[in-house]
Amino acid sequence: ADVGFAQCGLRRDYVEGTHTSPVGYLEGVFVQEEYRGRGVATALLRACEAWAGEKGCAEFASDCGLDNAASAVFHLRAGFAEAGRIICFTKRL
């Protein structure tokens, strides 16, 4: 049974707080609720980091919404440091 997934990629444009390019980027991670707290997300993250390292990345980054406290805790526990906060805007044309 699938218990979760992670999506990662390479970003060659500017990534907040980084100094190299490309940067490995965790686009998203999800673990089914009944499997949370068992290290699944951390294992998925480590696999993404290993993949990015194989692609020549010296840095790895991610983001989460300001209101997603659980994700912020996950990132900090996984060794990430907060690089900044942004407010996103849209408008109709």
Per-segment meaning from a language model:
Residues F60-S71, T90:
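Conserved beta-strand-loop-alpha-helix junction that forms the acyl-donor binding cleft
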Residues E27, V31, G37-A50, V73-R77:
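Conserved acetyl-CoA-binding loop-helix of GNAT-fold acetyltransferases
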Residues H19-E33, I87-C88:
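Conserved acetyl-CoA binding element of GNAT-fold acetyltransferases
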Residues R12-T20:
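A short, polar/charged loop-to-alpha-helix boundary motif
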Residues A1-L10, Y25, F30:
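Conserved beta-strand in the GNAT
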Residues C57, L76-R85:
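Conserved acetyl-CoA-binding loop of GNAT-fold acetyltransferases
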